[in-house]
Amino acid sequence: MKTLWIVAVWLIAVEGNLYQFGRMIWNRTGKLPILSYGSYGCYCGWGGQGPPKDATDRCCLVHDCCYTRVGDCSPKMTLYSYRFENGDIICDNKDPCKRAVCECDREAAICLGENVNTYDKKYKSYEDCTEEVQEC
């Protein structure tokens, strides 16, 4: 019941495609996205600076960079179509912005899944990110 409540609160709190991105992350990692990645390392969550703390954090930096590249598409608000098929995430969008945002999220979710073994609880709610922002 507690997990259901947490998921319900998370669904209410997200905006735009963040729910869609969260579903992709959950599918690839088995982790609740907002709890596991909402403030992980220096780049998972809002903002970011300093060197990534591990491969998981690097996935988030790459995702931030991807969102920067598609910034004119309002990536945090753009809703897109996708599906899970035979273990893959398929982006189903003819619109270039929707496809680009979906691909950013898809690649980040795959990266997080491939690096789930680098996830280290000591970087959850990590606050020592004081160095300069990493270049994309």
UniProtKB/Swiss-Prot annotation:
PROSITE patterns: PA2_ASP (PS00119), PA2_HIS (PS00118). It catalyses: a 1,2-diacyl-sn-glycero-3-phosphocholine + H2O = a 1-acyl-sn-glycero-3-phosphocholine + a fatty acid + H(+). GO terms for cellular component: extracellular region. Residues 1-16 form the signal peptide. It holds the Pfam family Phospholip_A2_1. InterPro entries: PLipase_A2, PLipase_A2_Asp_AS, PLipase_A2_dom, PLipase_A2_dom_sf, PLipase_A2_His_AS. It is found in: Secreted. Its EC number is 3.1.1.4. Optimum pH is 7.5. Ca(2+) binds at Y43, G45, G47, D64. Snake venom phospholipase A2 (PLA2) that inhibits human platelet aggregation induced by ADP, collagen and epinephrin (possibly by binding the platelet receptor alpha-IIb/beta-III) and induces mild edema in the foot pads of mice. PLA2 catalyzes the calcium-dependent hydrolysis of the 2-acyl groups in 3-sn-phosphoglycerides. This is Acidic phospholipase A2 EC-I. The lineage of its organism: Eukaryota, Metazoa, Chordata, Craniata, Vertebrata.
